[in-house]
């Protein structure tokens, strides 16, 4: 298999539809092992439209280049209540990715 699956989590703000279903926001990403490129992404926002929007924002970025550019794009283009939770989830996802890369280097 040429990809890995990683998830990042963050608390949702109160007053959101997704908060009625989930306590946390989760972003999942399928990532190319060699280049770190996000091949596919999903999140637990309440509407399919918002889920597709987030995937379209994230798809194609390489985590080898860091997480700052995807975070900047989310902040610029996602103007919903979950913006800060999306950023926190992305940071957590990137932390998981870094741990995977470090484990790979040490093994």
PLM features per residue range, with description:
Residues 1-9:
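Short, compositionally biased leader-like segments
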Residues 16-28, 33-107:
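Active-site- and interface-proximal helix/loop "cap" or "latch" segments in soluble metabolic
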Residues 8-16:
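Short Pro/Gly-enriched beta-strand edge/turn motifs at strand-loop
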